[in-house]
Amino acid sequence: NIKGVWNSCQASLKPMLKQGYGSIVIASSVTGDLVADAGEAAYAMTKSALVGLTKALAVEYAHKNIRINCTQLGYARTPMVEKMALESNPINPEEPIQDIASAVPMKRLAKPTEVGELFAFLGSDESSYLTGSQIVIDGGSTLPETLSMGTDH
């Protein structure tokens, strides 16, 4: 998760420096600096490192008109998620997907196209004043408190 992104950034920065502008979008995860799961310490560590890398590179290259941002994805309905669902429940693979979706405030997983549209926006001139940003795309999964004295909705 870290070495490949680092190498990709270094390779991408060279032509961007030459042309005088550019945008890099790093794919991170909500796992790491926002949430953590038992047994995923190494994954969480690497994804948190990507957030730090985003911020460090953003500061370093902002004056060169190069923007670096990161996305922090929750669950998306990708072929990988569908494969994991099939492996966990070969009889009814839709069940684990719905179990995850039911815990998301928006009651669904992200569509791959929604994630792609966020990447396209961050790479476009429409986001020209964003750098060093962490954009969470998780349907609100990281918003609720696990314990609350508030009212139920």
Question: What residues fall within each predicted segment?
Answer:
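Residue(s) in the substrate-gating loop at a strand-loop-helix junction
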Residues: 29
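Short, flexible catalytic-loop segment of classical short-chain dehydrogenase/reductase
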Residues: 33, 73-83, 87
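Alpha-helical segment proximal to the catalytic Tyr-Lys
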Residues: 14, 59-63, 128
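Active-site helix of classical SDR
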Residues: 9, 46, 54
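A conserved structural motif in NAD(P)-dependent oxidoreductases
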Residues: 91-92, 104-115
